[in-house]
Amino acid sequence: MRYWSWLFLLLCMPLYAAPDGKALYEENCSACHHFRGQGGIGLPLSTEILSQVSDDYIAKTIRHGRPGRIMPSFPKLSSAQVTAVVRYVRSWTGKPGPVFETAKIRGDAKKGNALYQKHCVRCHGKDGSGEGVGTGVTLSRERSFMVMPAALNNSGFQKSASDAMIRDIILIGRKSSNMPSFRGKLSGQEVAHVIAYLRTLEPPAPRKGAEEWAGKPAYVMESPYDLETTVENVKQALAGANFRIFPQRYLEQGLTDEFSVNVRQVAIRFCNFKELYHLLNIDPRLGTVLPCRINVLEQNGKVLVISANVAQLATLFNNQELSEVGVLMEEIILTVMEEATL
């Protein structure tokens, strides 16, 4: 009897130990890719796309992510967990994924560059970073692109995509992103040249923000003026920078009752609606921190002008395009704060 009990336990152990791909996907992936891969902030995992990418590519994409883009890496997932996620995603089509050779395809990168500039640069950009803004599918994207062209210079893509897979996509095309088929337009050797050139692409060095504020959660400047004058100075500087100013609020408003609000702590909220479409196109999650604000506080006999470090905040979104905007916004906000406190 004891023997059969041990045998039963041993047979059941793999069942209990096997990772749940559906649960792992819903926990780690569904927020961006939706529950059945419809896409949203992240790319749609459509039948067309899944028919063109291997299980190995999906697994490596999960493992490496897309540095500087919305797609994070998942180093904490075990190999078994990654495999479970891949199997779950693959189950949506009911078909096995393609298997590609791992051998390098030989070509002339110089000739590939000329072909890339002629056939690919319009959508994928001069440096391979992908023309347009944003990643995945967003409501604000121009409808000419259901999916934005891939960032071919991204290290995550370079590590995940085999030469053979890239060759097939070039030849077959991809309807969902308006990528045409180059079968009959490029010879096999010309495709090899393009692939050789793609392997030379590298991501651009990220633009850095002001070193003085690097790593700090907020910009803080002391004003030589009283609270009321400083508030007006900030508003004038914002108006001069083409920002629309929202009705004034106190910092504690909504957090305590109206009789306890500290009226010596003012929150000045502002936005440039002309740029709002552009920003939400880059990353719709940005809506969680909009509108921008500068706070003016009277504290311990001093008047302080404070704003969140937007360059630092932007890095939390894992989106290089947004990080670039964060640096530009940092320059504008610091200029406004400096003008208000001169």
Segments from the language model and where they lie:
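Extracytoplasmic electron-transfer domains, predominantly the class I c-type cytochrome c fold
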Residues: R36, G40, L45-T93, T138-T200
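Sec-dependent N-terminal signal peptides
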Residues: W4-M13
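The canonical Cys-X-X-Cys-His
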Residues: L24-F35, V85, V89, G112, ...
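Electrostatic cytochrome c docking/interface patches
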Residues: C12-L24, S91-L115, E131
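Beta-strand/loop substructures that line and gate deep hydrophobic ligand-binding cavities in soluble
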Residues: R293-N319
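Terminal, regulation- and interaction-focused segments at domain boundaries
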Residues: R207-F246, E338
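Ser/Thr-rich, low-complexity intrinsically disordered terminal regions
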Residues: K235-C292
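Well-ordered alpha/beta subsegment
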Residues: Q312, L316-L342
